[in-house]
Amino acid sequence: MTPGKTSLVSLLLLLSLEAIVKAGITIPRNPGCPNSEDKNFPRTVMVNLNIHNRNTNTNPKRSSDYYNRSTSPWNLHRNEDPERYPSVIWEAKCRHLGCINADGNVDYHMNSVPIQQEILVLRREPPHCPNSFRLEKILVSVGCTCVTPIVHHVA
């Protein structure tokens, strides 16, 4: 994810959190939660909106079925955590250890490896507190790619 997209995602997470709080969605409360009615409870959050690459050129005609057409195809798996926002993140898992050759067969002379990206999420802290979150980075597999294997030669 580019720095501009990361900032945008962070802003969207904060706006979503505000919408959840304003909507009054009931979430089971942990007795150790900070009291949002307390005068010392923070009412504002500073956010750096330094967005890079505002003009992202996306071609809507390009097919997005890369996960099937890749020489290193992958499946998407649901990663769910109710203490995180967003609570559901779809992660890529490589289908094969090797890569698909031109004949459509798995070639074990190459390796299929996940492509990982750090993203920002909101984590409830302490757990089960509806109005208390901390920003957290997590590593997510977003696709797979084909690489040459690392070979160690013994002398």
From Swiss-Prot:
Q: Which UniProt keywords apply?
A: Adaptive immunity, Cytokine, Disulfide bond, Glycoprotein, Immunity, Inflammatory response, Innate immunity, Secreted, Signal
Task: Share the record's PTM remark.
Answer: N-glycosylated. Found both in glycosylated and nonglycosylated forms.
Q: From the Swiss-Prot or TrEMBL record, state where the protein is found.
A: Secreted
Checking SUPFAM superfamilies in the record gives: Cystine-knot cytokines (SSF57501)
Expression is induced as follows: Induced upon differentiation of CD4-positive T cells. Up-regulated by IL23A-IL12B. Up-regulated in peripheral blood mononuclear cells upon West Nile virus infection.
Alphabetical GO CC annotations of the entry are: external side of plasma membrane; extracellular region; extracellular space
- Cystine links in this protein are 94-144, 99-146
Record note on what altering residue 78 to V does: Decreases the affinity for IL17RA by 5-fold
First-listed, main subcellular location of the protein, grouped into a coarse class: secreted
Please provide, alphabetically and separated by semicolons, the GO molecular function terms listed in this UniProt record: cytokine activity; protein heterodimerization activity; protein homodimerization activity
Q: Name one GO biological process term.
A: granulocyte migration
| InterPro entries registered for this protein in UniProt | Cystine-knot_cytokine, IL-17_chr, IL-17_fam
Entry's family note: Belongs to the IL-17 family.
Assembly, in brief, is: Homodimer. Forms complexes with IL17RA and IL17RC receptors with 2:1 binding stoichiometry: two receptor chains for one interleukin molecule. IL17A homodimer preferentially drives the formation of IL17RA-IL17RC heterodimeric receptor complex. IL17A homodimer adopts an asymmetrical ternary structure with one IL17RA molecule, allowing for high affinity interactions of one IL17A monomer with one IL17RA molecule (via D1 and D2 domains), while disfavoring binding of a second IL17RA molecule on the other IL17A monomer. Heterodimer with IL17F.
UniProt protein name: Interleukin-17A
Gene field? IL17A
